[in-house]
A protein has these predicted regions:
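A short beta-strand micro-motif
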Residues: 1-13
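SH3/SH3-like beta-barrel fold
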Residues: 5, 40-43
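A structural detector for beta-sheet-dominated domains
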Residues: 6-8, 31, 36, 53, ...
Length: 63
């Protein structure tokens, strides 16, 4: 499954300042996706969580 996350502009700017570069949107190959509290969680090789407050939108595609 392919997970695409489009982060909010504020988060993108913060990441660029912190790391020097940041690609938005981020695309991940994942095994599963679910919501838990205020987080979007997915299983890649381990469980990864993103704060929903940082996300503008996201979508999943099979394949």
């Amino acid at each position: 499954m392919r997970l695409t996350i489009v982060f909010k502009d504020e988060f993108e700017e913060h990441m660029k300042k912190q790391f020097g570069a940041f690609t938005n949107p981020q695309v991940y190959g994942v095994k599963s996706v679910h919501m838990e509290g205020g987080y979007l969680c997915s299983t890649i090789s381990d469980t990864v969580r993103w704060r929903m407050d940082d996300i503008s939108r996201f979508y999943c595609e099979e394949g």
